[in-house]
């Protein structure tokens, strides 16, 4: 049996009486309805872990967190789509060029688990009627790499790259102007970047909270962090703050020859939302969410863009 639950007026009383958060009037009632109690209000009250509840005095502070989260996702969503598509297309283009021995099937044969994953991904999309997959099956043609990449997740794409031969991985990162002899000796740079982006990509696409990086569930490569700090000149990157993901996205967009105007527009958009958050919530909460050096990192990012 499904219980009815509280009315919005009842929820507002509960928020006032139990949480000590001041919420009143039709405007705040509509805002609560728009964000939702569990997905919006409750998820905005804590930072990183549900045990780390913040003592906000009024509903506007909670709403400022929620609004910041939505705005950052609005900025990040097209960037993540563009970067994922571009990386896949560049690998497809690279595969098509006759450079050295690039038989990716030979490398994938070593990884039975990945081969099984590829087969199950293709079978799943065939059963769901994906037109591209069905076309090649019904034509009795082998499935080209671009068609497989069209239906893969970001994580599967990272696994695909990880199964390539080391010389092949290095060659591809060189082709993208991302190889560094000090930080990419094992050719793992690109897969580390992809695995780093997978959590935020999935959280953004599924409209989960990203403002405090609660989607982080893996250790990030120290090689990647050192490389990013070395390339951008920005220190103390640890991916505990959403600002660090902005740095990685700008770095990748710059490697993909995005104009300085566009890069500056993205950073400026983010910085306006950061400043608004700064002026809307207690300093303790702001520092926990974005760290104490967010403004410094943003300035470093602007400098990195102008130097390129």
Per-range role (PLM):
Residues 1-199, 211-308:
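Extended intrinsically disordered or low-complexity regions, especially N/C-terminal cytosolic tails and loops
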Residues 207:
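Acidic/aromatic/glycine-rich contiguous surface patches that form carbohydrate-binding/processing clefts
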